Amino acid sequence: AGVEITELSTHLQGQLVAVNPAYDEAFDAFAPAHLHGKPAARKDWAIDQMMKAAIASERLGLSHTVSFTGSLAFPFLYPWPQRPAGLVEEAFAELGRRWTPILNHYQDHGQDIGFEIHPGEDVFDGATFEMFVDACGGHEAAMINYDPSHFLLQQLDYLQFIDLYHERINAFHVKDAEFNPSGRQGVY
């Protein structure tokens, strides 16, 4: 018996693969101090860490990891003020350019990555996951880390999500969540 490792988590490293400049200072906290204030070097470090995690996962006899996609477009989630035409599409194209080589490396090492559908990430619901997979050429190593606690706050149907995406779910994280809106406060 004992404790069994089911997957490696690379949430912080994955986040740093794609950071909107508006978040640079905040996300520096996730990287080593010598990378603070150096977004390009921080991104390169994060990609290197992701590549190393694929090898570590393989050596541990695992086949799944979990991560975040990053947040190039998330500051523009709400459609007001109006986004410039093509902004979201270009952000997802850039995600595809950054993540496809990482996904290829994972696949070469018998791994896949379950991306957590999470507020604050560019992949925050089923529609954005589909956009991400399309941007990565339908990559088979792009999977979902299913954590329905976030779905409650986003008012997503967490059961129908399973019906729609069960073939892409590679991990399941469990924790409690509740939504208690009032006349003074909503989701956040």
Residues covered by each model-derived region:
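N-terminal substrate-binding region of glycoside hydrolase catalytic domains
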Residues: 1, 9, 20
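Short amphipathic alpha-helices and their capping/turn segments at secondary-structure boundaries
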Residues: 1-6, 49-64, 157-170
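Hydrophobic faces of well-ordered beta-strands that scaffold small-molecule active sites
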Residues: 5-10, 65-67, 113-115, 142-147, ...
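Gly/Pro-rich active-site loop or hairpin
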Residues: 92, 122, 126-130, 150-188
